[in-house]
Amino acid sequence: MTLIDGSKIAATIVAELKAEVAALTGRKPCIALVRIGEDPASVSYVKNKERTAAEIGLTGRVILPPVTISQAELFALIDGLNADAGVDGILVQAPMPKHLDELQVFRRIAPEKDVDGLGTMNLGKVAQDDDTGFVSCTPAGIMELLSRSGVDLKGKHVVVVGRSLLVGKPVALLALQKKAGANGTVTICHSATKDLPAITRQADVLIAAIGRAGFVTADMVKPGVVVIDVGINRVPDSTKKSGYRLVGDVDFPAVSPLASQITPVPGGVGPMTVAMLMKNTVKAYRLRQHRAG
């Protein structure tokens, strides 16, 4: 079994971006990070994104509107960022307060600044194999992990467990694309799938993104499978100062001996998500420069 070290691969991507940004003349790429409320995970995620942006040499502009902000007020804020020539990418951190419609918020971001890749236009471009759009960061990170770990999906059965807008649907589309590293045969499983283990045991590459701790067990995989564990779940652990530890959707101790390659949690997909956000921001900057002539 080989561990796919997402932290190491993400650090390589950050170093590549740092060199690319250092060579730019004039204004540096800028990402606006909008966080609404004090959800502990969101606070941590945004700080991490701000820190990584600074490490690369990007400008990270953190915006903290009140938790009571209305949909109309948030739209006005986004419209202002859309019109701001000094902003290349916009991310509104999810989850948002319940009174806000997240899907409408994602759609409000201008497609050319939608570096989180969750708007309608960019999701559509993924379906069309159009490289001018932005791929949502976790699916993009998964594909990058596979590529840099020597896993070519051509001719392989890729089973995705989970059908979310954030991971399941876009990663399935990416695995299907007619391009190098992709061309997989894809099955998507979800809560209504019958005899799930019979399907997951067919997987050459298994992507688990269901949000349930230890859901994928040893009897659900075949020997030699490549496992990408997207889940980040908190489980009680009295030995930890925080009172919990992070585990994935895969029962790592049981499944890892059967896998040819597997991502850990933490340190697998998570670091890649931030790295790909930064990569998308630099791409947005370059596309805008190109359009400006």
UniProtKB/Swiss-Prot annotation:
A single BP term in Gene Ontology: tetrahydrofolate interconversion
Pathway it works in: One-carbon metabolism; tetrahydrofolate interconversion
InterPro entries: Aminoacid_DH-like_N_sf (IPR046346), NAD(P)-bd_dom_sf (IPR036291), THF_DH/CycHdrlase (IPR000672), THF_DH/CycHdrlase_cat_dom (IPR020630), THF_DH/CycHdrlase_CS (IPR020867), THF_DH/CycHdrlase_NAD-bd_dom (IPR020631)
Keywords: Amino-acid biosynthesis, Histidine biosynthesis, Hydrolase, Methionine biosynthesis, Multifunctional enzyme, NADP, One-carbon metabolism, Oxidoreductase, Purine biosynthesis
Positions annotated to bind NADP(+): 162-164, 191, 232
GO MF entries: methenyltetrahydrofolate cyclohydrolase activity; methylenetetrahydrofolate dehydrogenase (NADP+) activity
Keyword NADP on entry: yes
Quaternary structure, from the entry: Homodimer.
Family: Belongs to the tetrahydrofolate dehydrogenase/cyclohydrolase family.
The protein's role, per its UniProt record: Catalyzes the oxidation of 5,10-methylenetetrahydrofolate to 5,10-methenyltetrahydrofolate and then the hydrolysis of 5,10-methenyltetrahydrofolate to 10-formyltetrahydrofolate.
Name recorded for this polypeptide: Bifunctional protein FolD
Gene that specifies this protein: folD
